[in-house]
Amino acid sequence: MFVRSSWLLLWGTIVWASAEPVTLHIGGTFPMESGSGGWAGGEACLPAVEMALKDVNSRLDILPGYVLNMTNHNSQCQPGLAMQQLYDFLYKPPTKLMLLTGCSPVTTVIAEAAPVWKLVVLSYGGSSPALSNRNRFPTLFRTHPSANMQNPTRIHIMEKFKWKRFTILMSVEEVFVTTAKDLEAIARKKGIKVDRQSFYGDPTDAMKTLQRQDARIIVGLFYVTEARKVLCQAYHHGLYGRRYVWFFIGWYADTWYIPPPEEHLNCTAEQMTEAAEYHFTTESVMLSRDNIPAISEMTGMQFQQRLTQYFQKDTANVGGFPEAPLAYDAVWALALAFNCTRNNLPSHIRLENFTYDNKVIADTLFQCVKNTSFRGVSGKVMFSDSGDRIARTQIEQMQGGKYKIMGYYDTTSGDLEWYNKEQWLNGKGPPPDSTVIKKHAMTVSNEFYYPTILFAVLGIAACVFIYLFTQKHHERLIIFQSQPECNNILLIGCSLCLFSLFLIGLPSDDISISESLFPLLCHARVTILLFGFTFAYGSMFAKVWIVHRMGATENQQLASRQKDEEENTPWEGIRTLISTMVGRQALMRKSSGQAYGALLEKRNTVLNQPISSSKFYVIVAALTAVDVFVCFVWVLIDPLHLTEQKFPLFTPADSEEDEMIMPVLQQCQSNQQEVWIGIIMGFKCLLLVFGTFLSYETRNLKLRFINDSRFVGLAIYNVAVMTLVTAPVVTLLIHGKVDANFAFISLTVLICTYISVGLIYGPKIRHIIKVPPSADEIQLNGNVGPGVMSKVDQKRYDMLKKENETLQIQIEEKERKIHECKERLEELTKNSETEDMNAQLLCENDKQIADENLTYSTATTLTTTIPLIDLQNGNHPGQIYENDNDDDGSSTSSDEILL
């Protein structure tokens, strides 16, 4: 049975061969010159198609009894001309079963109209991605892969060389516009930034734009005529060389960059060659390079050698030579589809019966083309559902004026086969995708940071030393009467302020802070400096506030006491004492007790009373609570975060020209930064001004248990002036100058802390070192005695003491005279009564003289002298007062006065 069937098939073939073959007509358009379309592909593709027709017609196993014949026209890649040629194909006999088209513009207009006449269109040169639209082109198939198939290859190359930005330069033809849109969409999905520039005819303006945009990686989408114009302008604008990488379409001729004389480009061949060096091309594989024969029984290389014989010039200058294998395989695909259709048609329908309204033959032919699969000279030929050719992409680079294959990309698998043979003009690897902009964090220079940190460490160490020193000598009167607990808060605050300089100076030249830790650094800066200021200044403010309040209380008590003294003044008793000294000792003792009681009351005022430490703690705690509340609300609703303030770029002196430095200032910022700064600074400024006012008001007040109030006031003056001057300067004038900003802040903190600690603790340390503990006025039982007098009080005391000594001498002289008078009175009593009367009169006169001399010790003098003598001798007033209640009759009048 098998032998019989074979003989029947052979007999049928012989019969068909012996009979006159039936001619099947096809129409073809070929762009024989570039024209305005820019691709003269017909120059090589037409000979390739003719070669394929000859080979197909010579095969007895394909379309037996039929021969293929083609009617062709030169479309010049002009859509309008192509429409006229389509009209000729349709309305001039014979009937065409299928159409072959070349460039994309021509394919677009023919394939869009062909379904009306039930024609299948097979394109050997249409690469426009728009042609993949099945709704618009339902009967189109292409042996030329879509231009979109090269886009994944381009993206893989970008990723391989770590380029995150490139620019598309395209002509405005639809094929390139759609390719650019697809490439941009893929790039954005990969996180690659894409810029686009288009031109029509003259690319000069577009090249200037590329230069302004600092484009470095440029993908060109245009026909070869525009490609030469672009390359010439790239040379004139300097957009070539080691800093630039160009991607061109791979189906140009190998010497496409050499300008033909008729184009009159303003570039020589040498200039164009220089500009074209090291560019890349991507193109679908159009020629099989293996040794496996195709359906035509030729390998790809054999086909290329055979086609070369058709030309009398270098094939590099032949338009469409790379696409010729696609045109050759298109004829074979067409022939196989006809053969398939012949075998699948009903017996009563034959191929030669095709008309433009024959749907049966058209549908059968469409399905046969769609299912076509064979090995051609361009590789495996098959079509996708959209009619596109499925093929690998080849990447080449021009090196030394010749193209070298760099690798292949398989679209179906997504694998990039790379040979690592790429070369670069600079010899240092691929150039960057743009001018390398290196961010340079504007940090505090080491020349400022480390000396400041040194002084801060010394200040903290000094605070620790002073604390230990005062703890060791806490029993000394000068320490005990200065509120040491409040002063310890000052030391803590100063230490926190000094420690904050470590954080304010970060990041420095040698110390960097990660972005994740920067918000924590921001909050630490604010809180530590804020609490340090509150502790340090708040402790001093608490002192001047309490001094002011106690001074006000003392003034009220003094006013009340003066009112009482006006009604019953003790000086009347003193005058009575002086006037009745002789012979009236009980009365004199009573009057002296009344006078000293008034002096004792004047001495035990509010200013000399002990002060509880809790009063200072309450004030500092209240100020701290305000800061805690503000910071908590700030962090909760509007936290600080890292922001970068960018400054103008500059080119470093010792770097490559494609590298620039962008200074960046890292700042702590919140959404309502000005509001929070205003709240904090407003409160602190009011506190500073009020503290300065209180210091001025209490400048003359001396409290025994705040013995350093005068130095506290001076420290407040210093802090207020430095802070009120520095804050506006730092906030408004030098906010963006890192070193100046840090210098102002650090100097303010250092000066305020050093001067405050020095003013408050310097005199104490000096006193403790120079004055031994035995000289302190501290009683053995631990009760505190009188305070140390100031220089003014000491001078006043010396004057009153000298006056008192003078008065004491005068009193002694008068007492001596009184004693003499008494003796004379006794003698005269013995002689006679008359003499007694005379002596009595004489004594009365002397007594009168004594009364007049004793008035030199005025009430004011005695009022001041008695307490000052008591202060100088260290006597407790209670001891003297107890002696006043003693009825010892042996005391003389001088003893009573000199208490």
Curated annotation (Swiss-Prot):
SUPFAM superfamilies linked: Periplasmic binding protein-like I (SSF53822)
One cellular component (GO) term of this entry: G protein-coupled GABA receptor complex
Glycan attachment sites: N69, N266, N339, N353, N371
Coiled coil: 791-842
Compartments, record wording: Cell membrane
Molecular function terms from GO: G protein-coupled GABA receptor activity
Membrane association type: Multi-pass membrane protein
Low complexity bias locations: 890-899
PROSITE patterns recorded: G_PROTEIN_RECEP_F3_4 (PS50259)
Intervals, Cytoplasmic compartment: 469-487, 547-616, 696-713, 763-899
Phenotype when the gene is knocked out: Increased lifespan. Increased sensitivity to the acetylcholine esterase inhibitor Aldicarb, which results in accelerated paralysis likely due to enhanced acetylcholine release by ventral cord neurons and enhanced depolarization of muscles on one side of the body. Double knockout with gbb-2 also results in increased sensitivity to Aldicarb and accelerated paralysis, but in addition results in irregular locomotory behavior characterized by increased speed of locomotion, decreased turning frequency, reduced rate of reversals, and an increased maximal distance covered in a 40 second interval.
Sequence intervals crossing the membrane: 448-468, 488-508, 526-546, 617-637, 675-695, 714-734, 742-762
Xref: InterPro entries: ANF_lig-bd_rcpt, GPCR3_GABA-B, GPCR_3_C, GPCR_3_GABA_rcpt_B1, Peripla_BP_I
Organ and tissue specificity: Expressed in the nervous system, including cholinergic motor neurons, but not in GABAergic motor neurons or muscle.
Chain positions covered by the region annotation Disordered: 870-899
Keyword Cell membrane: yes
Record family assignment: Belongs to the G-protein coupled receptor 3 family.
Subunit structure: May form a heterodimer with gbb-2.
Name of protein: Gamma-aminobutyric acid type B receptor subunit 1
Organism, as annotated: Caenorhabditis elegans
